[in-house]
Amino acid sequence: MISSIKPVLPSLTAIVGIGIYFAIWWALNGVFNNYNKKVLNAFPYLWLTLTLSLACGSLMMLVSWVALAHTIGHVEAIVSMSKVVVSFTHTSSKAVRQPLASLSQASSWARCALAAVMELNFNMIGFMGAMISNLAFVFRNIFSKKGMKGKSVSVMNYYACLSMMSLLIVTPFANSVEGPQMWADGWQNDVSKSDQTLSSKWVVAHSVFYHLYNQVSYIPRCLNHHLPNPLKHVNALGAAIAILGTFIYSQIKNRVKKNHILLVLCLGMLEPLVITL
């Protein structure tokens, strides 16, 4: 006997509410990325930067697999953005996990091409940082969804715990790799060239918006962790071709530095190929 049970469709209010959450999430993520790059350009001490951003939570737990995955993902994302432009990091680190999702990626191909054009020098550290960040955040999302099943803390408190656990993990590394003395010297030598007050505001804004955009991303807990990401992803084949084009261009540029005309011709031949992706 065939069951006559019909699936329950979400109401218009629920759909609009989820859409608002996603819009806020993406907006906060964009603001965070901009401030993050400003801070790294003015004060290139990535370990202090990521430590400060993780300090925007509440300390409630000590050790957790999800916190470790979150820490690795955040560290590698900051490492990648310190080496390459923001668009290249996000193009590389956001690969589509569902083949059928590529049908909705037409608007993302342009992003892929833009990232390749903007990042003219291929940087393996930046690329690998984005790849490791992507993998770590996948595990973080899976562990997080499992941790939210059954009787659990609220999503707001859950992410507060996650942030501070990551802070405990990353602080010893920040002190050993850079340390307070290096931060103080760097602040005097690097930031003194610009407005220190403005740079301080950038650091605060970067830390706050990092916490806000991640906190909002945890609110729609009813959804699978793949669903909020289609607009942030790019087709895997398109990303691979764009990254390959960036690498080829950087090699050509290094070989023809003394011949400006040949460099322009090579760029003209490469750019249409990348844009057509």
From Swiss-Prot:
Q: Is Cytoplasm given among the entry's keywords? A: no
* Subcellular localization: Membrane
* The keyword Metal-binding is annotated on this UniProt entry: no
Bilayer topology annotation:
Multi-pass membrane protein
Q: Which Pfam families match?
A: TPT (PF03151)
> Transmembrane region positions?
8-28, 46-66, 124-143, 153-173, 230-250
Q: Which family does it belong to?
A: Belongs to the TPT transporter family. GPT (TC 2.A.7.9) subfamily.
Protein name, as recorded = Putative glucose-6-phosphate/phosphate-translocator-like protein 1
- Organism of origin is Arabidopsis thaliana (Mouse-ear cress)
